[in-house]
């Protein structure tokens, strides 16, 4: 019986997008683990999850020692690792973010006070290149854990849902996500009444969201996001049922595990009698450091009063003190609608925003919200400096790289400084996802962009502060963002009073409110829509009306922050003289060899003569980067002389033919394959300076017009001006004089 293999599956119906089958299997692989499960997505993506517990508890710890590891195997995608040793090394960013996605809903589902080490190891064994494995891994982790005989209130179901062509699609593929307006991972569990309690959400808009909305798609507003959470619930229910079906056949009975409660009731009661009034008073101090100093003083008084009666129970006194603090903070918010620092529930702390915070860098900004202070720094470079990714994902390069640093001094402490921890990687990824939807395309802005967020001071949501600082820093660097993005952290506190649950949403939470609340969520977005959202809750479900009201409250705060940021900077600045100038030129593919020359002789000579840096793409696009614009132009002229000998230059005149008219001007063909724009403001000159309402009243398709090239932009687009004969005669007369 022990070696018998058991199966269960969930079939997800996506209507016109087809079905997805998630199959769970146990009893065939990793039989010595306490619990093991294999999750398949459509039989060609396979994730093995093994959950193991230590035999003895670590009773000296004051936290639950759960670790989650995701092992990406390159063989899963038919690859050999690209490293020197041709072996998998440190986990990729995708793997680390998946670890966090698994940890967040699973950790609060274990019995409180558990101190046995629990390790969940996920191995990605096979991957369809069009699939995303992260949600499969969350389900696999939950399944192996409920089979392991641990005190765990699972199962937990997780799905990715994306809004594609007006429909919420579960487990979308990479191909389908190209048309998605919004994409989110949702995890939850089924309650006794059959409803689904949402536990964790990680959501974002996509690179194409703005264009799709322009083309008529529905913008991902707060209402749409709430609808997406509801759409995910039936899928989560089906996944939980499949895991429960498997557990009913193969789960081990729940073992006896010692529970180490933080404190006994007698300690809490004695502490409450001893210091409640002093603690209440301390919690009214607005400043973080002053408040914490007073809280430490009250804690010492509590220890002095209680230790004679509770000798050797110092840890319990400390834990009870924290619990009493939490209780008092929550009571004050629920009853008086007043928070730790004296603010009302919707008040935002004092905001400050400035750009050009440090010299010489390509772009910088400083954003402050109360005691949270973030420095954003932008660096621009050639596209060949973008990050190369050797992962299981089909995405092989990343043009926008967002790094987040959280030094220990930001909270007035000492600690390790060095390579980023999982938390820093997670915060950087959240800020990155918030900004990506508003970035210009590679064609519009051919630069690799590195954004660094330095958390110089922390007291509540440095990740959302990073979004604000990054937006301003990018604009300061001259990056033409499609819209400004701001972020805010929200909290939710609930309490049952007279048999009815009361909810209070808090805007701009402090670090302490984050720890003491029932839910925290971070929302970033533009004035029009949400670009990123992260939600974690300890509640067994949030009423839809409460969530909708909290999201609206977050939107009001975001709009206020955007106004403050706009006062500091609202349009892209001129690029820094220290930033490289990058222009593009297109050449015929059959001319690439001539530009490179034998053994690279020609391209090396151009680079040496002009000081420019040249990158050639396979499609004939050439990126020219240089410290000065004149160097880049010199390289462009040399390349055009080789590959585009008929390429027009500024100041040259042509008798062109109008090939197309639009509301903003006329496109004029100068030579085969080379058109320029004669803007409506220039067409006025052909109408004697009169206002032109309709371009075709002056220039129709097929009309001949004498034009001069006024400007060639960084993408090679031509701007034209008309040549007026009378004006030319006047210029000649002036010259003769």
Curated annotation (Swiss-Prot):
Top-rank lineage group of the source organism: Bacteria
Catalytic activity reported: RNA(n+1) + phosphate = RNA(n) + a ribonucleoside 5'-diphosphate
Cofactor(s) needed by this chain: Mg(2+)
Molecular functions per Gene Ontology: 3'-5'-RNA exonuclease activity; magnesium ion binding; polyribonucleotide nucleotidyltransferase activity; RNA binding
Primary enzyme class: transferase
Any Pfam family the entry gives: KH_1
Localization (cell): Cytoplasm
UniProt cross-references to InterPro entries, sorted A to Z: ExoRNase_PH_dom1 (IPR001247), ExoRNase_PH_dom2_sf (IPR036345), GPSI/PNP (IPR014069), KH_dom (IPR004087), KH_dom_type_1 (IPR004088), KH_dom_type_1_sf (IPR036612), NA-bd_OB-fold (IPR012340), PNPase (IPR012162)
SMART domains (UniProt xref): KH, S1
Family the entry assigns: Belongs to the polyribonucleotide nucleotidyltransferase family.
Function comment: Involved in mRNA degradation. Catalyzes the phosphorolysis of single-stranded polyribonucleotides processively in the 3'- to 5'-direction.
NCBIfam families: polynuc_phos (TIGR03591), pppGpp_PNP (TIGR02696), PRK11824.1 (NF008805)
HAMAP family given in the database record: PNPase (MF_01595)
Protein name as it appears in the record: Polyribonucleotide nucleotidyltransferase
Organism: Streptomyces griseus subsp. griseus (strain JCM 4626 / CBS 651.72 / NBRC 13350 / KCC S-0626 / ISP 5235)
């Amino acid at each position: 019986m022990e070696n018998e293999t058991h199966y269960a599956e969930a079939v997800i119906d996506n209507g016109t997008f087809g079905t997805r089958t998630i199959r769970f299997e146990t009893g065939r692989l990793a039989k010595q683990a306490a619990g093991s499960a294999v999750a398949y997505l459509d039989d060609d993506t396979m994730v093995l999850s093994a959950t193991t517990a230590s035999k003895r508890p670590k009773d000296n710890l004051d936290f639950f020692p759960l670790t989650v590891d995701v092992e990406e195997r390159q063989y899963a995608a038919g690859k050999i690792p690209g490293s020197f040793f041709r072996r998998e090394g440190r986990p990729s960013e995708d793997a680390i973010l998946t670890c966090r996605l698994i940890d967040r809903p699973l950790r609060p589902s274990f019995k409180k006070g558990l101190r046995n080490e629990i390790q969940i190891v996920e191995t990605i064994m096979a991957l369809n290149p069009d699939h995303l494995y992260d949600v499969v891994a969350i389900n696999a982790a939950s399944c192996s854990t409920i089979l392991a005989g641990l005190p765990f209130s699972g199962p937990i179901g997780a799905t990715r849902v994306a809004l594609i062509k007006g429909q919420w699609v579960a487990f979308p593929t990479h191909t389908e996500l190209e048309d998605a307006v919004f994409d989110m991972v949702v995890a939850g569990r089924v309650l006794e009444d059959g409803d689904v309690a949402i536990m964790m959400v990680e959501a974002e808009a996509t690179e194409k969201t703005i264009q799709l909305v322009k083309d008529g798609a529905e913008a991902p507003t707060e209402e749409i996001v709430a609808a997406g959470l509801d759409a995910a619930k039936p899928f989560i229910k089906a996944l939980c049922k499949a895991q429960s079906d498997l557990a009913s056949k193969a789960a081990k009975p729940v073992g006896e595990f010692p529970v180490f409660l933080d404190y006994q009731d007698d300690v809490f009661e004695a502490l409450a009698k001893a210091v409640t009034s002093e603690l209440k008073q301390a919690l009214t101090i607005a400043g973080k450091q002053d408040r914490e100093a007073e809280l430490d003083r009250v804690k010492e008084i509590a220890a002095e009063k209680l230790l004679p009666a509770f000798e050797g129970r110092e840890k319990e006194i400390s834990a009870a003190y924290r619990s009493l603090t939490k209780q008092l903070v929550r009571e004050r918010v629920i009853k008086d609608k007043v928070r730790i620092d004296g603010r009302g529930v919707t008040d935002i702390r004092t905001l400050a925003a400035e750009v050009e915070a440090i010299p010489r860098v390509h772009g910088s900004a400083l954003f402050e919200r109360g005691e949270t202070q973030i420095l954003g720094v932008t660096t621009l470079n050639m596209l060949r400096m973008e990050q190369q990714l050797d992962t299981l994902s089909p995405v092989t390069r990343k043009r926008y790289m967002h790094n987040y640093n959280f030094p220990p001094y930001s909270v007035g402490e000492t600690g390790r400084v060095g390579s980023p921890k999982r938390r820093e990687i997670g915060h950087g990824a959240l800020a990155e996802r918030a900004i990506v939807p508003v970035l210009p395309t590679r064609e519009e802005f051919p630069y690799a962009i590195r954004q660094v967020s330095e958390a110089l001071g922390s007291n509540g949501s440095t990740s959302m502060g990073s979004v604000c600082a990054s937006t301003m820093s990018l604009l300061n660097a001259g990056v033409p963002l499609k819209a400004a993005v701001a972020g805010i952290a929200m909290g939710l506190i609930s309490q049952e009073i007279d048999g009815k649950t009361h909810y209070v949403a808090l805007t701009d939470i402090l670090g302490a409110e984050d720890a003491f609340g029932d839910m925290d969520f971070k929302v970033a977005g533009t004035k029009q829509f949400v670009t990123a959202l992260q939600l974690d809750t300890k509640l067994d479900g949030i009423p839809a009306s409460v969530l909708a009201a909290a999201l609206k409250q977050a939107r009001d705060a975001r709009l206020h922050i955007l106004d403050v940021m706009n006062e500091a900077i609202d349009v892209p600045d001129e690029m820094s003289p220290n930033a490289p100038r990058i222009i593009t030129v297109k050449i015929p593919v059959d001319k690439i060899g001539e530009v490179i020359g034998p053994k690279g002789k020609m391209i090396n000579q151009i680079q040496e003569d002009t000081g420019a840096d040249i990158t050639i793409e396979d499609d004939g696009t050439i990126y020219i980067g240089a410290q000065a614009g004149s160097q880049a132009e010199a390289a462009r002229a040399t390349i055009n002389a080789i590959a585009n000998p008929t390429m027009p230059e500024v100041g040259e005149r042509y008798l062109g033919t109008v090939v197309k008219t639009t509301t903003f001007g006329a496109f004029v063909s100068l030579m085969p394959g080379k058109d320029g724009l004669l803007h409506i403001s220039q067409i006025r000159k052909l109408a004697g300076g009169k206002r032109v309402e309709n371009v075709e009243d002056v220039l129709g398709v097929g009309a001949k017009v004498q034009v001069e090239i006024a400007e060639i932009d960084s993408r090679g687009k031509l701007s034209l001006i008309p040549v007026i004969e009378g004006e030319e005669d006047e210029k000649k007369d002036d010259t003769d004089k």
